């Protein structure tokens, strides 16, 4: 069985509208090829199916959450992307820290994926 592509891992499927916030240079190229009809924007209108926010501190994560939520359409997928502890960019963020701090914003973690050797992504869903 082949490994899933990055768009598949991030739930970017055919026809999906995705938004990127603070993505590192070259990240959009990592999403190529996109599934048929999928689009990626840095200027969301509040109707996105998938929203990805890149952060390097807990303060940045907490302050970005309202923008991510505002960009997300009903039933959308919200990802917080952060440097792996094993990467050169690592800092204060980890799965456990994000889980604890973002639960205070009404989000709970649902899944994790590896983006590359530097970045991990945690998917969050609204608390019921």
Regions found by a protein language model. Give the residues of each.
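N-terminal, charge-rich interaction modules
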Residues: 1-29
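Class I S-adenosyl-L-methionine
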Residues: 106-128
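Short acidic low-complexity segments
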Residues: 38-48
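Conserved Class I S-adenosyl-L-methionine
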Residues: 92-113
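Glycine-rich, highly charged phosphate/nucleotide-binding loops
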Residues: 34-40, 59-68
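Mid-chain, well-packed structural core segment of small domains
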Residues: 61-93
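Short, glycine-rich nucleotide/cofactor-binding loops
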Residues: 51-61
């Amino acid at each position: 069985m082949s490994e899933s592509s990055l768009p598949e891992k991030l739930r970017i499927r055919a026809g999906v509208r995705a938004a990127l916030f603070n993505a590192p240079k070259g990240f959009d190229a990592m999403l190529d090829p996109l599934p048929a009809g999928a689009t990626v924007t840095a200027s969301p209108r509040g109707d996105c199916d998938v929203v990805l926010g890149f952060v390097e501190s807990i303060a940045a994560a907490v302050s970005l959450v309202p923008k991510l939520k505002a960009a997300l359409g009903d039933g959308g997928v919200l990802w917080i992307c952060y440097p792996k502890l094993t990467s050169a960019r690592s800092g204060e963020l980890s799965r456990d820290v994000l889980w604890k701090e973002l639960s205070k914003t009404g989000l709970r973690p649902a899944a994790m994926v590896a983006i590359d050797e530097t970045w991990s992504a945690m998917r969050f869903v609204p608390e019921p």
